[in-house]
Swiss-Prot record:
<dbReference type="InterPro" id="IPR017340">
    <property type="entry name" value="U1_snRNP-C"/>
</dbReference>
<dbReference type="InterPro" id="IPR000690">
    <property type="entry name" value="Matrin/U1-C_Znf_C2H2"/>
</dbReference>
<dbReference type="GO" id="GO:0005685">
    <property type="term" value="C:U1 snRNP"/>
</dbReference>
<dbReference type="GO" id="GO:0015030">
    <property type="term" value="C:Cajal body"/>
</dbReference>
<feature type="compositionally biased region" description="Pro residues">
    <location>
        <begin position="63"/>
        <end position="92"/>
    </location>
</feature>
<dbReference type="GO" id="GO:0003727">
    <property type="term" value="F:single-stranded RNA binding"/>
</dbReference>
<keyword id="KW-0479">Metal-binding</keyword>
<keyword id="KW-0687">Ribonucleoprotein</keyword>
<keyword id="KW-0539">Nucleus</keyword>
<dbReference type="GO" id="GO:0000387">
    <property type="term" value="P:spliceosomal snRNP assembly"/>
</dbReference>
<dbReference type="GO" id="GO:0042803">
    <property type="term" value="F:protein homodimerization activity"/>
</dbReference>
<feature type="modified residue" description="N6-acetyllysine">
    <location>
        <position position="52"/>
    </location>
</feature>
<keyword id="KW-0862">Zinc</keyword>
<dbReference type="GO" id="GO:0008270">
    <property type="term" value="F:zinc ion binding"/>
</dbReference>
<dbReference type="Pfam" id="PF06220">
    <property type="entry name" value="zf-U1"/>
</dbReference>
<dbReference type="GO" id="GO:0071004">
    <property type="term" value="C:U2-type prespliceosome"/>
</dbReference>
<keyword id="KW-0007">Acetylation</keyword>
Amino acid sequence: MPKFYCDYCDTYLTHDSPSVRKTHCSGRKHKENVKDYYQKWMEEQAQSLIDKTTAAFQQGKIPPAPFSAPPPAGAMIPPPPSLPGPPRPGMMPAPHMGGPPMMPMMGPPPPGMMPVGPAPGMRPPMGGHMPMMPGPPMMRPPARPMMVPTRPGMTRPDR
């Protein structure tokens, strides 16, 4: 009867039967050996990729990163639009920088930017459900009625 060899454990099992293989493969030592094998394999793959990238860079096949070197003396790189910074020419300063306060948006929103939920100060229609809007479904309505504030600090169930 042929014996079963486990490459991960570097050992032969007593005989090649499904029950013996199943018992062996569910064992703690075998699972550790499998984990170690694939851990080493991933490390080898990563090192190989690093070596190939380094060789390609040294041969000039990969250009250096655009911002890897410091900018020359006197050069100023503007911050990305998402980062705060001094206002650039032609831009309106942010309200916290001493400029005029921003007016709230008036009128309908631009196409494709429909507000979600009722308009400020409006309550949903009787029954508590919002009318269906075109587009993908958002969230299902809450299981219990919404609490709508009547006065600051006071709430009552919506009817």
